[in-house]
Amino acid sequence: LYRPRGDGAAQDGSNTWSQVSKLADRIAHERALRDNVCIGEVRVTSPARTLVDCALLYPFEHVLSMFDSALRRGLVTREEIVAVCDGLRVDCGPVFRLLHYADARSENGGESFCRAVSIEEGFVPPQLQHTFYSRVTGKEAGRVDFIWHTEDGRIIVLEFDGMQKYIDPEMTSNRDVRQVVRDERQREQDLKEAGVSVVIRTNYIEVVQRAPFVMKLMQAGVPRAGAHPIFEHAD
């Protein structure tokens, strides 16, 4: 044991806890400054620091899209995000969870949100953006948002539909809603002929409500995390 002197130093010449704390605060402050960047005359946080801050403030399902998008656009690397965490004196568990599930192949925020909710509800993370080909002609049968393989050999596909696909002329190619629906059904048939067992369709409202979305996944037999360890990590 030792008694601190009035100047803050211990009698044995070592630093007191007060000095150590001040030093740590200074290091953290200097690290925070390095995490800032200037755009013109405006100082903003770097992409990596912004992602970390959001991960620590907001729910997983609302932040996964940010991580997916930043990785897809090449705004940040996983190593940069980890480096920010190394300089903080807080529990960065939520950040590392997001890094574990983040995937640059996710093409939009709706898909990321859908995937995040499925993970939160205990389902195995799906593979993303898989293309199927006809077993007969070899031609492309369709590119799907999400895919799961089950232990019994079934292939489950999930399509996340935004309302824009039915009303936006750029997405409908000027087809009316009835034609879009007919083409959608034909696409599902093509996918099944290419080996898909089940095609699930969902939308933003169902995912927000959760119960209808979860029921569809359960009825289709989407594997649960922990039940089939070899399928817990999407390729």
Where are these regions (language model features)?
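Surface segments flanking catalytic/ligand-binding clefts of nucleic-acid enzymes
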Residues: L71-D235
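Phosphate-handling catalytic interfaces
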Residues: L1-R115, V124-P125
